[in-house]
Amino acid sequence: MPDSHPNGSASTRSSGHRLGDQVDRVAGHVREAIEEAKPHFRGWLHAATAPLAAAAGIVLVALSPNAMTRTGSAVFAVSALVLFTVSAIYHRGRWSPRVWAFLRRFDHANIFLLIAGTYTPFSLLLLEGRNRVVLLAVVWTGAILGVLFRVFWAGAPRWLYTPIYMALGWAAVFYVNDFVHGTHPAVLTLMATGGLLYTLGGLVYGFQWPNPSPRWFGFHEVFHTLTIAAFVTHYVGVSIATYSLR
């Protein structure tokens, strides 16, 4: 049946388009204000770390003695490289609303993937049998659920998703005795130190403090610095455990 009110329908569509354009303009102005307020170092730390992580990952995989250790090293290296790269792209670029929203989801979801990616080589190297399978299943299931959580609820409050990151990151406490008996004290110390650095970074991110220089190096840069330090610490730990098998 022909539409009896074509002009009204067209007017409604036109109004909807105008409203959408207005929303996009407002979002653009808000984003520009945020860009102006961001510290100048925002994103540069992870941008500098990404190629170094790639090179370090290639070395780790190349020097891994067997297929199992190469798999663990590759998962660890790729998860770190993706996190640092996406973070740098997200924080340094000026994006349209849709691209910005996508990168934000990707950036936050990558934290879960790095947690699981870090657990992978340590579990393969230091645990055996059922304990290895269970811990990897738990952390990867948690990571996948965490990714879905951040993708479909991008606006979740910081106080909610930050503790979830931390809880998944400390899943190893249930296997501490197995890790103690399965590795050199230096590796265990590096594992724990890296975990503490990530936790400290999570607290800085959650409380947005300390914020030493809002114009140049704010709380987010402190958070990024701690994530880099934690990654380096875990990288050294994985390297020692891997090379001891050569």
Give residue spans per PLM region.
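Multi-pass alpha-helical transmembrane bundles in non-GPCR membrane proteins
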Residues: 1-246
